[in-house]
C-alpha cells in the first residue's frame, strides 16, 4: 500500500472485514446492551485508557435518547471506516428534534432527568455529527479516536455492513483505502448467506488490502483468482481522485452519484460472478465535482432509495447517509452494505 496524505509511519492500518454491530433500541434494557457493546468494541479497536468507558457513556446516552424520545431507533457500532477508532451511529424514525442547539447544551432536558445527553457526548467524542428533521427522525454519528489519530475521525467516509436478520455470519463486506492514487472503496456481496458467503467476502477484502493502489481491473482480477475455490461474489470498486470517479464492478453492486439536489448518474456492475465467470472488467469514469457524494451498495439495500429522494437524504454527510440508507431501505432477509464517500469542497 502506498501511503496517502498523512501516511508513512503510524499510517492507518487496514480495517478488518467485520460487520457492523446493530443494537435495536426497542426497550430500556437495550441501553445497557448498547453501552456494553461499545465498551467491548472500543477495546477491540485498541482505544487506550478511559476511552472504552467513554465510548460506553456515548452509546448509553444515545440509546437513552432513543428510548425516551423516539421510535424505530437503533445504534450501529463499528471500527472507523479508515484508521483507528470507534464509530457509534444512532438512527431513528422520528419525531426529530425541534431545538437541536438547545439539546446540545449541558443540562438541557425535555424530561425530568439529568439532561447530560448530547452535551456530554459532544465533550467526549472526537467528532460529533447530527442531522434532524421534524417528522423524519434524527441521525447522530459520534467518532472516538486515539489522541494521536484524531484525523481518522474526520474523514468524509461512511460504511455500514449488516448480516441478514437471524444470521450470525455476514456475506457482505466493505473496505476503504487512501493511497497516492486517491480514495479507493470496495463493496463485496458473497453469493448466498452464511459462513461460506462470509469467507468469500473476507477473502476479497484481504486481496484488496494487499494492493489497494492497483488499477481497478487488476483489483478485480486478483479477487477473481483468490475466489476460485469459493462461492464467488459480486464486487464493486470505486476510486475517487480530484474531480473524477472511476468505477469497476461485476455483479449486482451499484453506485450512484449525488449532488445536494439530485441523484446524478447510476451504474451497476457487469453481469457475472467474481471467482466463477467474470468478464474482462471495464472501468467507467464519471465526473465528480467538489461536493459530490458517491454511494456504493450491495443489493441488500433497495435501489428505490435513489428514485426521487428527499433533499434531507441527499445532503447528509457520508457517515449519516450510510446509516440512513441501511436503516430506511435495508432488505432484512439479505446482507446489506453501503459505502459513502464525498469529494472535498474547494475553498472559496
What is each model feature region?
Residues 153-171, 220-228, 253-285, 289, ...:
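PP2C/PPM family metal-dependent serine/threonine protein phosphatase catalytic domain
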Residues 191-212, 292-333, 347:
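Active-site-proximal, acidic helix/loop segment immediately C-terminal to a metal-coordinating Asp/Glu
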Residues 198-262, 267, 281, 341:
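Catalytic core of PPM/PP2C metal-dependent serine/threonine phosphatase domains
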Amino acid at each position: 500500500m502506498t501511503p496517502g496524505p498523512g501516511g508513512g509511519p503510524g499510517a492507518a492500518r487496514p480495517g478488518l472485514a467485520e460487520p457492523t454491530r446493530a443494537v435495536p433500541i426497542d426497550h430500556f434494557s437495550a441501553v445497557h446492551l448498547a453501552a456494553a457493546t461499545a465498551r467491548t468494541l472500543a477495546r477491540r479497536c485498541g482505544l487506550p485508557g478511559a476511552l472504552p468507558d467513554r465510548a460506553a457513556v456515548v452509546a448509553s446516552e444515545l440509546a437513552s435518547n432513543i428510548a425516551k424520545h423516539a421510535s424505530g431507533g437503533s445504534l450501529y457500532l463499528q471500527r472507523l471506516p479508515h484508521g483507528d477508532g470507534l464509530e457509534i451511529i444512532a438512527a431513528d424514525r422520528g419525531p426529530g428534534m425541534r431545538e437541536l442547539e438547545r439539546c446540545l447544551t449541558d443540562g438541557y432536558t425535555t424530561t425530568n432527568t439529568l439532561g447530560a445527553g448530547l452535551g456530554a457526548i459532544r465533550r467526549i467524542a472526537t467528532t460529533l455529527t447530527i442531522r434532524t428533521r421534524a417528522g423524519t427522525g434524527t441521525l447522530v454519528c459520534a467518532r472516538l479516536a486515539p489522541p494521536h489519530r484524531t484525523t481518522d475521525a474526520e474523514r468524509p467516509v461512511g460504511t455500514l455492513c449488516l448480516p441478514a436478520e437471524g444470521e450470525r455470519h455476514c456475506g457482505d463486506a466493505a473496505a476503504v483505502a487512501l493511497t497516492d492514487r486517491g480514495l479507493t472503496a470496495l463493496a463485496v456481496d458473497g453469493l448466498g448467506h452464511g459462513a461460506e458467503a462470509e469467507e468469500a467476502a473476507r477473502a476479497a477484502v484481504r486481496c484488496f488490502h494487499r494492493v489497494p493502489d492497483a488499477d481497478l481491473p487488476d483489483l478485480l482480477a486478483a479477487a477473481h483468482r483468490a475466489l476460485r475455490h469459493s462461492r464467488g461474489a459480486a464486487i464493486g470498486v470505486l476510486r475517487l481522485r480530484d474531480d473524477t470517479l472511476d468505477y469497476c464492478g461485476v455483479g449486482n453492486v451499484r453506485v450512484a452519484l449525488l449532488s445536494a439536489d439530485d441523484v446524478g448518474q447510476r451504474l451497476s456492475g457487469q453481469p457475472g460472478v467474481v471467482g466463477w465467470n467474470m468478464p474482462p472488467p471495464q472501468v467507467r469514469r464519471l465526473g465528480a465535482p467538489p461536493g459530490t457524494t458517491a454511494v456504493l451498495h450491495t443489493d441488500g439495500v433497495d435501489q428505490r432509495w435513489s428514485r426521487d429522494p428527499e433533499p434531507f437524504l441527499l445532503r447528509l454527510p457520508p457517515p449519516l447517509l450510510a446509516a440512513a440508507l441501511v436503516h430506511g431501505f435495508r432488505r432484512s432477509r439479505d446482507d446489506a452494505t453501503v459505502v459513502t464517500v464525498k469529494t472535498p469542497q474547494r475553498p472559496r
